[in-house]
Amino acid sequence: MRRELLLEKIETYKAIMPWYVLDYYQSQLAVPYRFTTLYEYLKEYKRFFDWLMDADLTQAPKIADIDLSTLEHLTKKDLEAFVLYLRERPSLNTYSTKEGLSQTTINRTLSALSSLYKYLTEEVENDQGEPYFYRNVMKKVSTKKKKETLASRAENIKQKLFLGDETLAFLDYVDKEYEQKLSNRAKSSFRKNKERDLAIIALLLASGVRLSEAVNLDLKDVNLNMMIIEVIRKGGKRDSVNVAGFAKGYLESYLAVRQRRYKAEKQDLAFFLTEYRGVPNRMDASSIEKMVGKYSEDFKIRVTPHKLRHTLATRLYDATKSQVLVSHQLGHSSTQVTDLYTHIVNDEQKNALDNL
């Protein structure tokens, strides 16, 4: 989502929230939380407060009037009823056959509520230096996590990775073959954005940065001489990320057309731009997800930008056998999350042996 639109949506949610949620929001800006995270949390709070009113657990006529005592005196049974509601409510997605929300979505909702409750019961200080209240009912609510071994997860993921020669083959396909299947009208749109789209895909495959990190790149953050980019990692930390050399040509080709094709002026700082009616804007995450999905589906299998991150990590581990190096490249503080790539590479080695 474009930053300007994201901030606009955040303000819309803030306008209907109780004062203590606004306090929480302001506090989290200092952490700092990403605006995308805060936006998702505000959406979850609206979902929760709407349910409180529908379930007659508050007499407030509107969300902004729900007082602190309502949250303070909610019971474990109340929260379990909310979880049951989420699990069984009709899906808003008309294309889905599921009756309720996924466990992943439910966990995200509970995570947002846990963060709010922790703030209200531990972090905030009133005039007497005490939290608003002490009883944190969220500590009594358990979340159900998907059980899956690393080996099982590796098996599921590796089918959606572009390993070995497929990394460059994917880029080559978008560059030289994709448009052959398009109508003349579709070709015109494809050619306008071809260099940009290739640059985005190449950067994701060559650096392993997160989608949000690619979206938030500015021109000043990209050093093609050193093949290093500066990104803001989770938690607000700046990091320098090395980029594999095969991406350089694609990035240079995009920069050669960026100003002219997207009507970019000096004040347009975003690295990846889109243009509508002569106005350039930062390309948003949703557009990049759709773009990657479209090209990858035509090439082999529909994947997300995060699978391109997994692709880079797996290839890097295969080349170096260093979990430390991979974790640094991905911006992780621990090597634990890179265990997945050892399983994928070990499976690939086993398959190679079986073919001898």
From Swiss-Prot:
Could you confirm whether the keyword Protein transport appears in this record? Answer: no
Q: Which GO terms describe its molecular function?
A: DNA binding; tyrosine-based site-specific recombinase activity
Q: Record's PROSITE patterns?
A: CB, TYR_RECOMBINASE
Q: Which residues form the Tyr recombinase domain?
A: 169-354
Q: Which GO terms describe its cellular component?
A: cytoplasm
Major subcellular location class: cytoplasm
InterPro entries for the chain? CB (IPR044068), DNA_brk_join_enz (IPR011010), Integrase-like_cat_sf (IPR013762), Integrase_catalytic (IPR002104), Integrase_recombinase_N (IPR010998), Integrase_SAM-like_N (IPR004107), Recomb_XerS (IPR023670), Tyrosine_recombinase_XerCD (IPR050090)
Start and end residues of each Core-binding (CB) domain: 16-121
The yes or no answer to whether the keyword DNA-binding is present is yes
Ranges annotated as spanning the membrane: none
Q: Which UniProt keywords are given for this protein, alphabetically ordered?
A: Cell cycle, Cell division, Chromosome partition, Cytoplasm, DNA integration, DNA recombination, DNA-binding
Q: Which residues form the active site?
A: 210, 234, 306, 309, 332, 341
Give me any GO biological process, just one: chromosome segregation
Cited Pfam families: Phage_int_SAM_1, Phage_integrase
Modulation of this protein's activity: FtsK is required for recombination.
Q: Where in the cell is it found?
A: Cytoplasm
What does this protein's UniProt record list under function? Answer: Site-specific tyrosine recombinase, which acts by catalyzing the cutting and rejoining of the recombining DNA molecules. Essential to convert dimers of the bacterial chromosome into monomers to permit their segregation at cell division.
Supply the NCBIfam families for this chain: PRK05084.1
Q: Which family does it belong to?
A: Belongs to the 'phage' integrase family. XerS subfamily.
Q: What is this protein called?
A: Tyrosine recombinase XerS
Organism equals Streptococcus pyogenes serotype M49 (strain NZ131)
| Gene giving rise to this polypeptide | xerS
